[in-house]
Amino acid sequence: MPWRKTCDPYKILVSEMMLQQTQVERVMPFYKDFLREFPTACALAAGSLADVLKAWNGLGYNRRAKYLHEAVKRLSSMPNVMLSPSHGNKIAYEDLRRLPGVGEYTAKAMRVFAWDEPEVLIETNIRAAFIHHFFPHTLDVHDRAILAYAKEAARAQDPREWHWALMDYGAHLKKTLLNPSRKSAHYAKQSKFEGS
């Protein structure tokens, strides 16, 4: 996965926005094409919304493209904030949460994958791993129950490597077993993609 080969905050933000509600295999070609069109945060901020939507076309959930464009423009206008790999300033969780289209998970994922900050992430594959091991006979497992285990397990781990390993393991479980995430109180079956 190309976003695992970078710590560039801009490229991490692009990947996290694209991966919302969309599977990795579907995102990969769009991610590469989008970054060819908009290789830097400055290029995206300077681009028109029409060009951004054109580059996003076919991925679906086009509101994410609009939010990404708005978020990067907003970040570009903030003093002491730059989305570039050479700029050492980390963006605070609270500032990330104020951006359009950036929820709790995306803000924490940005901090983990761009700056190796010790946040604790819960997403579908991580949820599957914890449910499989700690709640094998429980239905309607809430994320707050998983969070206690996730916080303890994440201690003294490299944040990036730990979360990537959990994501990969959870994805493996979902392919080889009945999806453990179905026991989550947050589970909702997605309909098949039919264009956008």
Per-region residue spans from a language model:
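Catalytic cores of DNA base-excision repair glycosylases
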Residues: M1-G195
